[in-house]
């Protein structure tokens, strides 16, 4: 009966017969909840470490990807530049070929003219020699 009157007053005895303000069942549940919370906090801490490691890994991979992307862009630009240089060089060579063809044609005309002059001079010399 004394226990009931103490219980009504909000006082309880635990398993060691110590006087407590909380009901022993509530105290036990509070202790269990406290341990579950501690386990939960530990798991959250571990989860944050794992996630932090994954974030670092993803950041590292993103940097490597960005570097490779920049290398690929540089290589593509270099290839475009080389193609443009080759095209310009090809145009220069075509222009040089056209110039050399024109020069060859002038030389051919000059050669034909000189051959004609030589033939005329040889004919003149032959006529001159025949007259003597």
UniProtKB/Swiss-Prot annotation:
Pfam families: IFT20 (PF14931). Residues 87-112 form a coiled coil. Involved in ciliary process assembly. May play a role in the trafficking of ciliary membrane proteins from the Golgi complex to the cilium. Regulates the platelet-derived growth factor receptor-alpha (PDGFRA) signaling pathway. Plays an important role in spermatogenesis, particularly spermiogenesis, when germ cells form flagella. It is found in: Golgi apparatus, cis-Golgi network; Cytoplasm, Cytoskeleton, Microtubule organizing center, Centrosome, Centriole; Cell projection, Cilium; Golgi apparatus. The keyword Cytoplasm applies. InterPro entries: FT20. This is Intraflagellar transport protein 20 homolog A. Keywords: Cell projection, Cilium biogenesis/degradation, Coiled coil, Cytoplasm, Cytoskeleton, Differentiation, Golgi apparatus, Spermatogenesis. It comes from the Eukaryota. One of its GO terms (biological process) is spermatogenesis. The lineage of its organism: Eukaryota, Metazoa, Chordata, Craniata, Vertebrata. It comes from Xenopus laevis. One of its GO terms (cellular component) is centriole.
């Amino acid at each position: 009966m004394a226990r009931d009157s103490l219980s009504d007053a909000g006082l309880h005895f635990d398993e060691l017969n110590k006087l407590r303000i909380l009901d022993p069942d509530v105290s036990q549940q509070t202790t269990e909840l406290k341990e579950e919370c501690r386990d939960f906090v530990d798991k959250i801490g571990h989860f944050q470490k794992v996630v932090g490691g994954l974030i670092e890994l993803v950041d590292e991979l993103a940097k490597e990807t960005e570097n490779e992307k920049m290398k690929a862009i540089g290589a593509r630009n270099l290839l475009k530049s080389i193609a443009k240089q080759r095209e310009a060089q090809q145009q220069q060579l075509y222009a040089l070929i056209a110039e050399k063809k024109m020069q060859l044609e002038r030389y051919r005309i000059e050669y034909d003219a000189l051959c004609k002059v030589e033939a005329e001079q040889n004919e003149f010399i032959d006529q001159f020699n025949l007259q003597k």
